[in-house]
């Protein structure tokens, strides 16, 4: 995938639209990556995995689709976004008003995904907001693989759902 072809256009779009990548610290980080780094083209297949979506017939059978190249398209296919006809009841869901994403995947959502959409001549999401992680008492991010998560179902057995939502929204620091 010719990611390099969209570098300047991405810089121009993000510069012209301050809300395209938020918060401002993440926007600055993405712009710095676009301006300072060599934007290599992106290989859409991988050989290091024995799992994944196979490449179409005619490609090397040892290759599978690069997971991010495939996964990002789910946003569009989930709302039947390629069909912009009046008959598509979901057409008003694309482009997305805002993608809310974790800070560890902002590059994929703020560089790769918009470039993929531009290559297909499709509108890009209006904005992406990158949030931080919920941290455990030791300061590490909460993660199932670390085994330090809180079971939300246990919390809902103790507290009303609206109270729990309010707590999470009011105490979380977006962008941290």
Predicted regions span which residues?
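Structured secondary-structure scaffolds
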Residues: 1-176
């Amino acid at each position: 995938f010719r990611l390099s072809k969209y570098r300047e256009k991405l810089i121009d779009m993000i510069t012209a639209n301050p809300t395209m990548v938020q918060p401002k610290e993440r926007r600055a980080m993405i712009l710095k990556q676009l301006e300072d780094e060599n934007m290599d083209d992106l290989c859409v297949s991988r050989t290091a995995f024995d799992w994944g979506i196979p490449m179409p017939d005619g490609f090397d059978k040892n290759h599978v689709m690069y997971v991010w190249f495939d996964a990002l398209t789910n946003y569009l296919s989930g709302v039947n976004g390629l069909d912009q006809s009046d008959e598509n009841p979901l057409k008003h869901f694309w482009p997305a008003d805002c993608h809310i994403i974790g800070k560890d995947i902002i590059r994929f959502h703020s560089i790769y995904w918009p470039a993929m959409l531009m290559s297909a001549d499709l509108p890009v999401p209006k904005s992406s907001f990158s949030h931080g992680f919920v941290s455990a008492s030791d300061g590490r991010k909460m993660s199932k693989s670390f085994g330090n998560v809180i079971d939300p179902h246990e919390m809902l057995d103790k507290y009303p759902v609206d109270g729990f939502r309010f707590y999470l929204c009011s105490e979380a620091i977006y962008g941290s």
